[in-house]
C-alpha cells in the first residue's frame, strides 16, 4: 500500500516537472536589451572649450532680480492649462499603478445570490422535479439562496503582476519628470517672451530718437530750400529716411503686440486681466557651462529623467511578458451558507466551505506569448534607442547653446567698442559745433551713427539674454531628480 502511494507521488512529481520544463521550453530565443549610453560618454567634444560655470539654481529667474518677471512666472505656474494637464497625467499614472497593485492583493467580496428555478423533469436533476416530501423533494420549484464571503489570491511566484506594477510605477515617475519638464518649458518661455518685449521697448525708444534726429534734419533742409540755400535733393533724402524709420517703428509696435498676446496665452490671462509690463533694462547674464556633464546632466534634465523612467518601465514590461510563460497559481475560497429552501438558509447544516487551489500552465497558445514577448522587447529597445538619442541631443543642445552664447558675448564686446567709437565722433562733432566750426545740423546728424550702433548692440544684448535662457533650459533650469516613487 505504501509502495503504491510512493509510486503515485513519484509519478505526479515526474509529470509536474515535465510539465514545468515543457512550459519553459515554449520560450523562444529572446533578443538582448540594447545598450544604454553610459554616463562617462556624456561629454562635449574635445575641441569645444567653453567658459566654466555652475549648474542653474532652482527658481533661476529670481537671480535676474525682476519683480515683473517673478509675478508673470508665478501666475503662469498657478494658472497654466498645460501644467494642469501634466499634473492630471500624474494622477492618471498613479491611479494606473494603484489599480495594478490592487489586482495582486487578496480580494475578498461579500456574495449574496437568490435563484428561483423550476427543475426539468427530463433533465439531469429530474429526481428533484418530483413532489415527494418523504424523500426530501418538494419540486419542481425551488428557491436556492447563497450568502457568504468569497476570497481570491493570485500567488505571483514569477513576478507577472510585480513587474507590471513596477512598470506602472516607472510610468508614474516619468509623469512626475514630465511635469517638471513642462514647468521648465513654461518658465523659460515666459522669460524669453518677456525679455523680447523689453528689447522691443528699447528698440522703439532708439527708433523714436532716430526719428527725432531725422525730423530735425527734414525741417532744416526744408528751411534751406525755402530760402534758396540748397536744392531739394537733401530734403527728399531726409524725408525718405524718416519714412523708413516710421516703417520700422510700426513693425516694432506690431511685434510688441504679438509678443504680448503670446505672453497672454502662455500665462493664461484673459482679455482684460493682462498685467501691464513696464520697460526695464535687459539683465547681464552668465555665459558659462558646468565643467563636466556626465551623470549630472541626466539627473538635471527632466526630459531625460522621464525617458530614463520610460526605459525602466519598458524593461519591467519585458520581465512581465517573460513571466507569463511560467505556471500561475491562485487560491480561491468560499465560506458561507447555501440552501435550496429559504427557511433552512440560516441553519447550521447550511454551512458551506470551498477551498480551490488552482494551477494554470500555457502549453499551446499558437505563439501568442512569444509574439507578445517579441513585441514588448522591440518596444523596449525602441525606447532605449530613443533615450540614447535624447541624451545625445541634450549634449548637443548644451554645446550649441554654450557656443552661441560665447560667440555672442565676443561679438558684444566688439560692438560695444564700435558704439564707443561712434560716440567719440559725435562728441567731436558737438565740440566742433560749439566752436563754430560746423553747423547745428551736422552736429545733430552725428547722432545717427551712434543710434544705429546702439541698435546693433541692443540686438546682441537681446540675443544674449534669450540664448542664456535657452542654455539654462538645456542645463535643466535647476531641476534635480525627485526621490523615487516606490511601491509601498
Q: Model-found features: residue ranges?
A:
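Small/polar, glycine/serine/threonine/aspartate-rich low-complexity segments that form flexible
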Residues: 55-64, 113-150, 273-290, 319, ...
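A short glycine-centered flexible hinge/capping loop motif at secondary-structure junctions
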Residues: 225-229, 433-437, 474-478
Amino acid at each position: 500500500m505504501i509502495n503504491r502511494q510512493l509510486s503515485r507521488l513519484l509519478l505526479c512529481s515526474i509529470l509536474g516537472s515535465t510539465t514545468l520544463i515543457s512550459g519553459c521550453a515554449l520560450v523562444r530565443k529572446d533578443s538582448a536589451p540594447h545598450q544604454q549610453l553610459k554616463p562617462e560618454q556624456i561629454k562635449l567634444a574635445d575641441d569645444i572649450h567653453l567658459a566654466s560655470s555652475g549648474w542653474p539654481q532652482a527658481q533661476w529667474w529670481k537671480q535676474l532680480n525682476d519683480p515683473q518677471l517673478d509675478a508673470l512666472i508665478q501666475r503662469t505656474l498657478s494658472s497654466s492649462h498645460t501644467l494642469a494637464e501634466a499634473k492630471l497625467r500624474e494622477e492618471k499614472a498613479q491611479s494606473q499603478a494603484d489599480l495594478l497593485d490592487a489586482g495582486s492583493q487578496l480580494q475578498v467580496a461579500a456574495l449574496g445570490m437568490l435563484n428561483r428555478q423550476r427543475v426539468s423533469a427530463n433533465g439531469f436533476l429530474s429526481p428533484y422535479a418530483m413532489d415527494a416530501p418523504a424523500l426530501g423533494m418538494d419540486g419542481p420549484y425551488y428557491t436556492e439562496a447563497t450568502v457568504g464571503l468569497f476570497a481570491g489570491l493570485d500567488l505571483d511566484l514569477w513576478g507577472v503582476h510585480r513587474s507590471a506594477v513596477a512598470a506602472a510605477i516607472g510610468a508614474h515617475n516619468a509623469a512626475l519628470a514630465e511635469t517638471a519638464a513642462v514647468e521648465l518649458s513654461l518658465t523659460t518661455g515666459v522669460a524669453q517672451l518677456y525679455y523680447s518685449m523689453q528689447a522691443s521697448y528699447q528698440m522703439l525708444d532708439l527708433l523714436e530718437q532716430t526719428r527725432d534726429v531725422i525730423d530735425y534734419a527734414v525741417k532744416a533742409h526744408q528751411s534751406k530750400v525755402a530760402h534758396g540755400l540748397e536744392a531739394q535733393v537733401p530734403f527728399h533724402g531726409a524725408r525718405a529716411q524718416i519714412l523708413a524709420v516710421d516703417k520700422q517703428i510700426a513693425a516694432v509696435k506690431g511685434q510688441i503686440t504679438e509678443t504680448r498676446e503670446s505672453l497672454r496665452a502662455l500665462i493664461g490671462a484673459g482679455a482684460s486681466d493682462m498685467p501691464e509690463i513696464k520697460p526695464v533694462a535687459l539683465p547681464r547674464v552668465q555665459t558659462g557651462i558646468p565643467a563636466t556633464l556626465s551623470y549630472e546632466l541626466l539627473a538635471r534634465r527632466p526630459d531625460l529623467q522621464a525617458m530614463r523612467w520610460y526605459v525602466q518601465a519598458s524593461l519591467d514590461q519585458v520581465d512581465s511578458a517573460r513571466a507569463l510563460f511560467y505556471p500561475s497559481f491562485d487560491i480561491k475560497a468560499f465560506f458561507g451558507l447555501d440552501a435550496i429552501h429559504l427557511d433552512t438558509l440560516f441553519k447550521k447544516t447550511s454551512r458551506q466551505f470551498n477551498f480551490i487551489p488552482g494551477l494554470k500552465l500555457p502549453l499551446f497558445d499558437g505563439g501568442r506569448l512569444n509574439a507578445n514577448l517579441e513585441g514588448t522587447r522591440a518596444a523596449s529597445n525602441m525606447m532605449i534607442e530613443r533615450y540614447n538619442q535624447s541624451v545625445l541631443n541634450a549634449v548637443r543642445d548644451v554645446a550649441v547653446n554654450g557656443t552661441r552664447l560665447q560667440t555672442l558675448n565676443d561679438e558684444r564686446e566688439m560692438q560695444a567698442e564700435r558704439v564707443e567709437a561712434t560716440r567719440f565722433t559725435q562728441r567731436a562733432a558737438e565740440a566742433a559745433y560749439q566752436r563754430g566750426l560746423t553747423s547745428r545740423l551736422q552736429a545733430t546728424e552725428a547722432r545717427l551713427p551712434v543710434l544705429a550702433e546702439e541698435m546693433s548692440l541692443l540686438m546682441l544684448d537681446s540675443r544674449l539674454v534669450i540664448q542664456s535662457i535657452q542654455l539654462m533650459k538645456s542645463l535643466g533650469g535647476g531641476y534635480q531628480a525627485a526621490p523615487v516613487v516606490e511601491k509601498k
